[in-house]
Regions:
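Adenine nucleotide-associated cytosolic modules
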Residues: 1-185
Length: 185
């Protein structure tokens, strides 16, 4: 299973998957923990501030269940690296915080023929959607995104970046609940 995003949603998802005994995890995140993460990201602690989220996640998995094989990618996902990141995966879990990367990941999962589990939060609200390879609608169609059927060129990317603006405050239980449900799916 590949989990893309090791922050609020992803941290909880990763911990639950490790506790459930999932044998192999691929963890992806380019960010490092900072002080603002402590209120909602269960993998974050004072001693981890400034450290790469994917590296911290790997160590936490090792402490929970040393039998889980963990591979990490400390990089941003884009069209050039997504296939490499998910090449060994049977499932991709989206714990991302931006629409453009979700489109890239969802397209790659559909092309590979594997489930894409989407999770997102906004303030005190959250959502989960599971897209199977044979799902009637894609992620882009479900949310009526301006990228439907289009190449991800500069114009389409700009349109996707304009879909969401501003990040509302998030309290800890919201990403943790969504992360647990993603692991359950």
């Amino acid at each position: 299973i590949t989990v893309i995003g090791c922050g609020g949603i992803g941290g909880e998802t990763i911990e639950m998957l490790a506790r459930m005994g999932i044998g192999e995890l691929v963890l992806v995140d380019k960010d490092a923990f900072d002080l603002s993460n402590l209120n909602r990201q269960t993998l974050a602690s004072i001693k981890d501030l400034g450290l790469d989220k994917s590296a911290v996640a790997k160590e936490k998995v090792r402490l929970i269940n040393p039998y889980v094989k963990v591979t990490t990618f400390n990089e941003h996902i884009d069209q050039t690296n997504i296939k490499k990141v998910i090449e060994t995966s049977d499932i991709v879990i989206d714990a991302l915080d931006n629409v453009l990367t979700r489109v890239i990941v969802s397209r790659a999962a559909k092309e590979k023929g594997i489930p894409y589990i989407h999770g997102a939060i906004h303030g005190t609200m959250g959502q989960i959607t599971v897209f199977l390879p044979n799902s009637e609608k894609t992620y882009e169609e479900m949310f009526n995104l301006p990228s439907i059927g289009k190449e991800l060129n500069e114009e389409t990317i700009d349109a996707l970046k304009n879909v969401t603006s501003g990040v509302p405050p998030v309290i800890g239980p919201t990403p943790n609940l969504i992360g647990c449900i993603e692991a359950f799916e």
